[in-house]
């Protein structure tokens, strides 16, 4: 398997849905087994997918996209977009008047360049049918309110503090942690740069979303320390009551080492917040 997940020299693909930028897809140099690339699932709006393409220095001649059954055995739709530019709209909802998003499907996108192709994969579903928008809105609200340490906005009633939560550290926070730890203690973090949102699962029961981003916090020596954060949500939207419930929450943060900053004081090495059990 050859993937170029972080290389800026390779084109990058993401999707827009209801104002959210979602699912930055890794690019593969070779076609993949469709049953082995299930890391993300992308909601479709009114039969259309809005694709954002960062070409960098590459010249993209055309884009092919193919919709398959989820097991990859049946090809349902195949289309081409010439000179797609930075944004493209993919029509994926209907074939000969028949709705092909009545169930989960697999999407393959191929970018054709001068001397090579790149392949991208995601599962796709009907976003409105599975209440994707209100679920994403809930995640965004919880995420932003936790960062801001906002009170009276439902965080305290959504979490389930118990002995399962480790309230001695901010490195790993869960739905079982207390309100103080879920809302970042005294760190007052500021998001640095963009956030990467990946929908890991979306079905009739729940949505699972993972956020990746960096934050700046004041460290032990009153300097700004930077941390890499992963924040996971599993939520359920109930159409009848129009309410969203938090089913699971898990957040980790690890300090990004900066050799230009002071790393020693009279107490020894300044470690910041890191995993107690690094791999």
What are the functions of these language-model segments?
Residues 3-64, 72-74, 104-187, 267-279:
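Core segments of small alpha/beta cavity-forming domains
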Residues 70-88:
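Solvent-exposed serine/threonine-rich low-complexity stretches and specific carbohydrate-binding patches
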Residues 70-73, 163-165, 171, 240-269:
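Surface-exposed loop/turn elements that mediate protein-protein interactions on large endomembrane-trafficking
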Residues 83-95, 263:
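Aromatic sugar-binding surface patches on proteins
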Residues 94-104:
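Surface-exposed, short loops/turns at beta-strand junctions within beta-sandwich domains
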Residues 195-200, 230-236:
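Hydrophobic/aromatic beta-strand elements that line small-molecule binding cavities or substrate pockets
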Residues 200-215:
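A short hydrophobic beta-strand element
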Residues 212-228:
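Short, cysteine-centered beta-strand-loop-beta hairpins and adjacent loop/turn segments enriched
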């Amino acid at each position: 398997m050859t993937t170029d997940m972080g290389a800026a020299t390779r084109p990058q693909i993401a999707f827009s849905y209801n104002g959210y930028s979602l699912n930055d897809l890794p690019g593969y140099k070779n076609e993949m087994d469709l049953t082995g690339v299930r890391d993300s699932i992308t909601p479709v709006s009114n039969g259309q997918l809005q694709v954002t393409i960062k070409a960098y220095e590459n010249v993209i001649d055309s884009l092919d996209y193919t919709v398959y059954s989820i097991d990859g055995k049946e090809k349902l739709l195949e289309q081409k977009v010439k000179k797609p530019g930075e944004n493209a709209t993919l029509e994926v909802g209907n074939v000969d008047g028949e709705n092909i998003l009545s169930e989960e499907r697999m999407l393959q996108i191929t970018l054709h360049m001068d001397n090579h192709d790149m392949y991208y994969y995601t599962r796709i579903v009907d976003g409105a049918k599975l209440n994707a928008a209100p679920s994403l809105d809930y995640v965004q609200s919880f995420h932003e309110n936790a960062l801001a340490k906002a009170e009276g906005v439902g965080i305290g009633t959504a979490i389930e503090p118990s002995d399962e939560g480790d309230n001695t550290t901010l490195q790993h926070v869960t739905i079982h942690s207390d309100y103080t730890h879920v809302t970042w203690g005294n760190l007052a973090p500021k998001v640095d740069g963009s956030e990467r949102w990946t929908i890991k699962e979306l079905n009739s029961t729940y949505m699972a979303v993972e956020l990746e981003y960096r934050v700046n916090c004041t460290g032990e020596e009153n300097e700004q320390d930077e941390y890499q954060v992963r924040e996971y949500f599993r939520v359920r939207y109930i159409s009848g009551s129009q309410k969203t419930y938090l089913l699971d929450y898990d957040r980790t943060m690890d300090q990004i080492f900066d050799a230009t900053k002071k790393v020693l004081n009279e107490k020894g090495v300044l470690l910041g917040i890191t995993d107690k059990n690094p791999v």
